[in-house]
Amino acid sequence: MKNKDAVFKALNDSTRRLILDELSERNEMTLYELTIRLITKHSLDISRQAIAKHLSLLDEAELVKTTRKGKYRVLTFNKEPLRNLLEDWLE
């Protein structure tokens, strides 16, 4: 139940949903790349620090994974929590 609540909390914000949209469209991005895409594509007035806070909530819900590639931290969209949530309801 706790993870379900975390998923719903994470999805309850339009900026976090845009982040997931961008990661779904182009998986594996750095925070810098994600910030640039959100600012240019969606005309958001948002800082990297604000995006990092949104990412921490997405991470708590296990919707975003961060891995190291060289000196960069790369973000990916983990769709499993959403699949599990829907499967529980649809079974």
Report residues per predicted region.
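Single-residue recognition of alpha-helix boundary sites
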Residues: 27, 65, 89-90
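Short, hydrophobic-biased segments on the C-terminal half of alpha helices
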Residues: 55-56
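A generic local structural motif
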Residues: 5-6, 61
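Beta-hairpin "wing" of winged helix-turn-helix
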Residues: 59-69, 76
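Phospho-regulated, low-complexity intrinsically disordered regions of nuclear gene-regulatory
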Residues: 78-91
